[in-house]
């Protein structure tokens, strides 16, 4: 694809949009945001860039993420972001290590809640349905454990 560029262009923001999308599509999102190219006039520009979807079978409640170098194969191109995507559901299954020796706990989210009873090894299986949209994923920090 050939794109004509004016010789007077001194800033990235003066480049044609097609070329700018190509350049920004090669950068990580954090770097794109730090360039401040996404100004008020280009606020929705990142919705047209390809995004990476992180596939990892276990989501950890303490927000630890796997080492990026070892988990690079779990990053796969996902669908492009747009406002008309339908919300999707996914099931998150996680082990919670509880500091108590007996009793039951109630796991509550904004969407669904389920009663958990831990076993001899003091761990529970958390299985909840979380509604996903193209913009937000319910944070695991929002899951509250309450002792019954």
UniProtKB/Swiss-Prot annotation:
Cited InterPro entries: F-box-like_dom_sf, F-box_dom
Q: Which PROSITE patterns match?
A: FBOX
Q: Which residues form the F-box domain?
A: 9-59
Instruction: Give one Pfam hit by family name.
Output: F-box
In Swiss-Prot or TrEMBL terms, this protein is called F-box protein At3g55900
Q: Which organism is it from?
A: Arabidopsis thaliana
Q: What is the lineage of its organism?
A: Eukaryota, Viridiplantae, Streptophyta, Embryophyta, Tracheophyta
């Amino acid at each position: 694809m050939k794109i004509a560029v004016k010789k007077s262009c001194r800033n990235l923001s003066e480049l044609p949009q097609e070329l700018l999308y190509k350049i920004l599509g090669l950068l990580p999102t954090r770097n794109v945001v730090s360039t401040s190219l996404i100004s008020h006039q280009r606020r929705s520009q990142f919705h047209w860039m390809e995004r990476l979807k992180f596939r990892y079978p276990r989501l950890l409640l303490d927000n630890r993420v796997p080492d990026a170098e070892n988990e690079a194969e779990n990053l796969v191109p996902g669908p492009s972001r747009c406002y008309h995507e339908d919300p999707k559901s996914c099931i998150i299954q996680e082990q919670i290590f509880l500091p108590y020796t007996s009793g039951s706990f109630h796991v509550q989210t904004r969407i669904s809640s389920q009663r958990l009873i831990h076993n001899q090894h003091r761990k529970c299986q958390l299985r909840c349905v979380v509604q996903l949209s193209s913009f937000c994923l319910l944070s695991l920090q929002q899951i509250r454990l309450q002792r019954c």
